[in-house]
Amino acid sequence: MDKSCGVVLFNSGKVLLLRHSSISSRGGGHWDFPKGHIDDGETEIQTALRELVEETGIEQVKVVDGFRDTIIYTFPRGQEQIGKEVVFFIATTKESKVTLSHEHIDYSWLDFDSAFSRLTYDNARQVLRNAIEFYVSA
């Protein structure tokens, strides 16, 4: 099973979403959180933070302790169905400037309702719902 890790990033009541380019992703153009594959020797949180920097240029973040949410899904690769596990963490930042990687074509800092509408996949909306519930009660 493929494994990736990502970050639900909050800044002053808004959440960051990235729009994938059609080049880097089979489902090109979809809106999601910063995330990516684990490199050998990395922890889940190290992966999530590295991917955040690579995909957004945002380095100054504070991880919110105690939140870890996982989604599992399958996607087609050739004739195969590939299983994928994605682990998400919450972080906060005061930075709002985003420098996109080649994997993305757009970004938005959105209020929670707008983020729910913009996210492409239901499982990402559930992660956001869980993250908001945890964050506002922390």
Where are these regions (language model features)?
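C-terminal alpha-helix
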Residues: 130-137
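The catalytic Nudix box helix
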Residues: 33-67
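Short aromatic/basic micro-patch
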Residues: 32, 83, 109
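Short, well-ordered beta-strand micro-motif
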Residues: 9, 19, 88-92, 111
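N-terminal strand-loop-strand
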Residues: 1-33
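Active-site segment of metal-dependent pyrophosphate-handling enzymes
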Residues: 57-96
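NUDIX/MutT-family hydrolases
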Residues: 97-128
